[in-house]
Curated annotation (Swiss-Prot):
Subcellular location as annotated: Membrane
Biological-process GO terms, alphabetical: female gonad development; lipid metabolic process; response to estradiol
Matches recorded under Gene3D superfamilies: Cytochrome P450
Protein's name in the database: Brain aromatase
Gene name per UniProt: cyp19a1
Species the sequence originates in: Carassius auratus (Goldfish)
Binding site for heme: 435
Topological relation to the membrane, as annotated: Peripheral membrane protein
Catalytic activity of the protein: testosterone + 3 reduced [NADPH--hemoprotein reductase] + 3 O2 = 17beta-estradiol + formate + 3 oxidized [NADPH--hemoprotein reductase] + 4 H2O + 4 H(+); androst-4-ene-3,17-dione + 3 reduced [NADPH--hemoprotein reductase] + 3 O2 = estrone + formate + 3 oxidized [NADPH--hemoprotein reductase] + 4 H2O + 4 H(+)
Length: 510
């Protein structure tokens, strides 16, 4: 486990130092584009930074590179209001945090495209491949059917048992994640759980979870680093090379796993059950998908959980311990509805307190708090003209704290005491490009939390809360793991039920 942490921290540190060193050089090179561009001036009337003889676009773009996408979005919405206009890599970009504007974009077929650096997407294999950033709509619709089939129906029903089994498996070897002081590396525990779940549901072949997690972390760091970089960044081979190698490392590993799966299928006398990877391989055999399509789809299915669901669970455990009354209510609900047995699919709809807790956690401290889209045709949003090709960033996290909720800046289950209209709460998006895994994500979250909380109460280090730990907000909200020991927690068997933390009952506010 120390190797996982060391590899992750060293790679992330190298990424940060390199990007900071290059920012000045890259922005100077962009000057030529700035002063020769014809369509960068504000034609829409949306509030935002001024042109300033071409310095406005440079300054706004540099802020995104420097602060990260999520943090920069919050900065501009705070400064200019719920609809703000900036420039990213020379392209006019609207940042929306008003519910009416966000809902309009989510529900419309005009905004099913996504924007990012073409070369950046090519680096990570997402340019016109996979499902996450694929803007080849014909191919996207085709592969989405495979994701939908795997993430709904029988796959959804099966996920509860798989989550229970995978969680218990890792909890039974908790000592492998525990240091000499008795603190558990909870982030990597959760990552191992969700990788195991993903493999059992979608790939079903033997793999080294910890080794794969190292590669996933490097890939994710590369994804964040290259997503909105200018083209010149990719010409600097002495810098770009390590990102290219990190992405290729996971792509090659996924290629090997897919080939291993293919051989396993060929060696079967009878195929009683199919899964996500099997369906994709059959599609390739019928020339419906390419080898690269299959590899990228499997890659995206496998990486989706470790750096979204696992981090969400981590934040939820922190919030739970900051709100001990809520933890008490959840545990009592589990005991009354489930008792000593394992949770089953039919139990989930009975766990109302847990449901409200998860929703409030996703609202109050989301891992992914924005969505990137592109206008396919001219449109109008809340009275503002949106030209074809305009980029849009939907600042969902800020929207969740600025409208509708009675206590928007406080973690409080009363925010979900009554039904919340969908236009005001969109943790997974909605409409034609909604997150295809939104239903299974909720099921997995519930199953893992119930299994874990039935056995243990989790105690973070003193002073470790969602508002005090260091975090970055670029592609997603991530705890900074420079000192992973500070993020470790004690796992105390539920029968003992003591943490020794004098601040357990404090209200959580931001």
């Amino acid at each position: 486990m120390e190797e996982v942490l060391k590899g992750t921290v060293n790679f992330a540190a190298a990424v940060q130092v390199t990007l900071m060193a290059l920012t000045g050089t890259l922005l100077l090179i962009l000057l030529h584009r700035i002063f020769t561009a014809k369509n960068w001036r504000n034609q829409s009337g949306v509030p935002g930074p001024g042109w300033l003889l071409g310095l406005g676009p440079i300054m706004s773009y540099s802020r995104f590179l420097w602060m990260g996408i999520g943090s920069a979005c919050n900065y501009y919405n705070e400064k200019y209001g719920s609809i703000a206009r900036v420039w990213i890599s020379g392209e006019e970009t609207f940042i929306l945090s008003k519910s009416s504007a966000v809902y309009h974009v989510l529900k419309s077929n005009n905004y099913t495209g996504r924007f990012a650096s073409k070369k950046g997407l090519q680096c990570i294999g997402m340019f016109e491949q996979g499902i996450i950033f694929n803007s080849n709509m014909a191919l996207w619709k085709k592969v989405r059917t495979y994701f939908t089939k795997a993430l709904t129906g029988p796959g959804l029903q099966k996920s509860v048992d798989v989550c229970v089994s995978a969680t218990n498996k890792q909890l039974n070897v908790l000592q492998e994640f525990t240091d000499h002081s008795g603190h558990v590396d909870v982030l990597n525990l959760l990552r191992c759980i969700v990788v195991d779940v993903s493999n059992r549901l979608f790939l079903r072949i033997p793999l080294n979870e910890k080794d794969l997690l190292i590669k996933i972390h490097r890939y994710f760091s590369t994804w964040q680093a290259v997503l909105i970089q200018p083209d010149v960044f990719f010409r600097l081979n002495f810098v770009y090379k390590k990102y290219h190698l990190a992405a290729k490392e996971l792509q090659d590993e996924m290629g090997k796993l897919v080939e291993q799966k293919r051989q396993a299928i060929n060696n079967m006398e009878k195929l009683d059950e199919t899964d996500f990877a099997t369906e994709l391989i059959f599609a390739q055999n019928h020339d419906e998908l390419s080898v690269d399509d299959v590899r990228q789809c499997v890659l995206e299915m496998v990486i989706a959980a470790p750096d979204t669901l696992s981090i969400s669970l981590f934040f939820m455990l922190l919030l739970l311990k900051q709100n001990s009354v809520v933890e008490e209510q959840i545990v009592q609900e589990i005991q009354s509805q489930i008792g000593e047995r394992d949770v089953e699919s039919a139990d989930l709809q009975k766990l109302n307190v847990l449901e409200r807790f998860i929703k409030e956690s996703l609202r109050f401290h989301p891992v992914v708090d924005f969505i990137m889209r592109r206008a396919l045709e001219d449109d109008e949003i809340d009275g503002y003209r949106v030209a074809k090709g305009t980029n849009l960033i939907l600042n969902i996290g800020r929207m969740h704290k600025s409208e509708f909720f009675q206590k928007p800046n406080e973690f409080n289950l009363e925010n979900f005491e009554n039904t919340v209209p969908s236009r005001y709460f969109q943790p997974f998006g909605c409409g034609p490009r909604a997150c295809v895994g939104k239903h299974i994500a909720m099921v997995m979250t519930k199953a893992i939390l119930v299994t874990l909380l039935s056995r243990f109460t989790v105690c973070p280090r003193h002073g470790c809360t969602v508002s005090t730990i260091k975090q970055t907000n670029n592609l997603s909200m991530q705890p900074v793991e420079e000192d992973p020991d500070s993020l470790a927690m004690r796992f105390i068997p539920r029968a003992q039920n003591i943490c020794g933390d004098p601040h357990l009952g404090e209200k959580t506010e931001e």
